[in-house]
Amino acid sequence: MSLQFAKYHGLGNDFILVDNRESGEPRLTPEQAVQVCDRNFGVGADGVIFALPGSGDSDYVMRIFNSDGSEPEMCGNGIRCLAKFLSELDGGAQSRYRIATGAGLIVPTLTETGLVTVDMGPAYLKPVEIPTTLTGTGDRVVEADLEVGDRPWKVTTVSMGNPHCITFVEDVAAVPLAEIGPLFEHHPVFPQRTNTEFVEVVRPDYLKMRVWERGAGATLACGTGACATLVAAVLTGRSDRQATVELPGGPLQIEWREDGHLFMTGPAVKVFSGSMELAA
């Protein structure tokens, strides 16, 4: 089996994009996606994204397999890459797409500057929506106590259609991400596991973040994580509603509008196109 693909990245968060418009099911199995994502024996990527035919009021459907074969609901950097990929496939005929994801309908728009702005929809804050068994004040978990790795942490939980646990630190560079990240991801208070963001507030309009992604580990960027980070920073009084979130791969501009929707603006870059032989 020969797989035709294009590789894109959003701030170093890299993906294999597959034109899957002829079928409503991904061309690869989760096991094959693991093979493709392997950085030694495959192409190498944080995940494989499939552009499937639209349904209902969507132009396309987005499916993703992480590098471990798991399937997340959505990916912010990935959907920017998908928008650029779709624009290439249709010859630039569209600049705005309505894409159905496991987190709902997401609308990316290609800007004249080459960046992609995405209406990420609203954040969800109720514990059952994360989901988490943590209890908080009212209908949200803000600065809750959680012991991870034999030390206490203050955590805020946010769902962008996928689960996020945000904790604020003095020095984000000093966080032992490879050690503590898996402990957060698999903590029993998160029945569907979680993405975890470690955040340093430089200014109310400038946040530095590192992320441990559920199913992918440490990555250079996470779009939904940047959105969840801004929400947590606003809820805890640390940030304005519009801020730059600096990730290891570069900055994203995030805005939490008064109507509740979050908008993310950032790059998506094509690296190359190619083919790979896979066992049938």
UniProtKB/Swiss-Prot annotation:
Record: residues binding substrate: 13, 66, 76-77, 162, 195, 213-214, 223-224
Subcellular location: Cytoplasm
A GO term for molecular function: diaminopimelate epimerase activity
Residues annotated as the enzyme's active site: 75 (proton donor), 222 (proton acceptor)
Pathway(s) the chain acts in: Amino-acid biosynthesis; L-lysine biosynthesis via DAP pathway; DL-2,6-diaminopimelate from LL-2,6-diaminopimelate: step 1/1
EC number: 5.1.1.7
GO biological process terms held by the UniProt record: lysine biosynthetic process via diaminopimelate
Enzyme class: isomerase
Signal sequence, renumbered to the chain: none
Keywords: Amino-acid biosynthesis, Cytoplasm, Isomerase, Lysine biosynthesis
GO cellular component: cytosol
Catalytic activity: (2S,6S)-2,6-diaminopimelate = meso-2,6-diaminopimelate
Pfam family, one: DAP_epimerase
SUPFAM superfamilies per record: Diaminopimelate epimerase-like
Site feature Could be important to modulate the pK values of the two catalytic cysteine residues, where: 164, 213
Record's function text: Catalyzes the stereoinversion of LL-2,6-diaminopimelate (L,L-DAP) to meso-diaminopimelate (meso-DAP), a precursor of L-lysine and an essential component of the bacterial peptidoglycan.
HAMAP family linked: DAP_epimerase
Family, similarity comment: Belongs to the diaminopimelate epimerase family.
NCBIfam families on file: DapF (TIGR00652)
Subunit structure: Homodimer.
Protein name: Diaminopimelate epimerase
Phylogenetic placement of the source organism: Bacteria, Bacillati, Cyanobacteriota, Cyanophyceae, Synechococcales
